A protein has these predicted regions:
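Amphipathic alpha-helical interface elements
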Residues: 1-65, 79, 83-105, 128-134
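Juxtamembrane loop-transmembrane helix junctions in multi-pass integral membrane proteins
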Residues: 8, 70, 74-77
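Amphipathic, Lys/Arg-enriched alpha-helical patches that create a basic surface
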Residues: 109-134
């Protein structure tokens, strides 16, 4: 039998928290990129993107960048950066948005996007994903 589980390992929790915080920083940088490509103030950009998630921010940046940068080297470089952000977010989401569960008197698992159970990542594995996000 497998049941929902809240991890208690301090190293896992540290790594999980840092990954979550690093991703919040990434989203903030995407908001600041909206500011730059839209040529608006910080406050205006923050207000305009307040409830936008990572995907919506990347899509908004792509649209604004095509308009403001045209077919340029800068646009291609920005598009490549946005693709790396998308991959980093997907890796982070594997851990943050999935269920953690434990077998009775057994191992701890995380459910994958394809509804399979895999071992809970270690703190060093989470640190590696955090480094991708940063």
């Amino acid at each position: 039998m497998i049941s929902p589980h809240l991890p208690v390992d301090p190293e896992f929790l540290r790594a999980f928290a840092q990954l979550t915080i690093a991703h919040a920083h990434l989203d903030h940088m995407l908001r600041m990129t909206v500011k730059t490509v839209a040529d608006v103030s910080i406050g205006q950009a923050l207000d305009a993107t307040k409830y936008d998630g990572s995907r919506a921010l990347r899509e908004r940046i792509r649209k604004l960048a095509r308009q403001s940068l045209g077919a340029s080297r800068a646009l291609v470089l920005l598009q490549a950066l946005l693709q790396r952000c998308e991959r980093a977010t997907a890796r982070r989401n594997e851990f943050v948005h999935n269920i953690i569960a434990k077998e009775l008197d057994g191992d701890v698992f995380v459910m994958t996007d394809d509804n399979q159970w895999k071992p809970l990542p270690t703190a060093p594995e989470l640190d590696a994903v955090r480094d991708e996000v940063e």
